[in-house]
Amino acid sequence: MKQVRFLPQPARRARAAAARRPGAAALAAAALALAGCAQIPREPITQQPMSAMPPMPPAMQAPGSIYNPGYAGRPLFEDQRPRNVGDILTIVIAENINATKSSGANTNRQGNTSFDVPTAGFLGGLFNKANLSAQGANKFAATGGASAANTFNGTITVTVTNVLPNGNLVVSGEKQMLINQGNEFVRFSGIVNPNTISGQNSVYSTQVADARIEYSAKGYINEAETMGWLQRFFLNIAPW
């Protein structure tokens, strides 16, 4: 005999809710995964690391003479220009770049062909008069242009992270500013010739080799300028 058992209404609701939980959990996990793809992390273009600590000086000794090998300061008759790992240097950013490019192309070709077939005798009734002619023309014209202007002025203090065998200094540093819930930062890295450093312990960015300057931000404004993950998805698969 087949038995049918009816569950109370609260029990049926609880069982239905339990059956829906795995699907809801999977949907929530998928939503979180897609939300994580909404913001693509931007890798810095500057050379890492951004700072370096000077090496530890040797242990202090007291031999009783004027010369002390454990002295970590600068010599008396030495200038204050950076020359060791951990020294700091001020970079005066003065970048002004203008670029203009224009191009054009023009092509024109024409052709004309005519072929007459005279007929005589018994061929006259078959072909009568046959005139063959063909004409063709091909014309192409295109123009293009592009222009760009970039200006960046400011100052940033960097740290010597390495000293090359020829004496050039590898510098790198960053400056962060938190303004109205937006974190803005400036990063700089490059190779400096010590001979170009001024008496104020500064050098222009135009005199730095392999200079890499980055100005970016993190916050609501930066997120508003970023395309959403769903829009990027349809942009990649759209055929037009």
UniProtKB/Swiss-Prot annotation:
Cell compartments where the protein resides: Cell outer membrane; Bacterial flagellum basal body
InterPro entries in UniProt: Flag_Lring
Superkingdom assignment: Bacteria
Keywords: Bacterial flagellum, Cell outer membrane, Membrane, Signal
Signal peptide segment: 1-35
GO CC field: bacterial-type flagellum basal body, distal rod, L ring; cell outer membrane
Pfam families the UniProt entry points to: FlgH
Swiss-Prot/TrEMBL GO biological process terms: bacterial-type flagellum-dependent cell motility
GO molecular function: cytoskeletal motor activity
Subunit structure: The basal body constitutes a major portion of the flagellar organelle and consists of four rings (L,P,S, and M) mounted on a central rod.
NCBIfam families: PRK12697.1
Record-stated family: Belongs to the FlgH family.
Functional description taken from the UniProt entry: Assembles around the rod to form the L-ring and probably protects the motor/basal body from shearing forces during rotation.
HAMAP family according to UniProt: FlgH
Protein name, entry field: Flagellar L-ring protein
Source species: Burkholderia pseudomallei (strain K96243)
Taxonomic lineage of the native organism: Bacteria, Pseudomonadati, Pseudomonadota, Betaproteobacteria, Burkholderiales
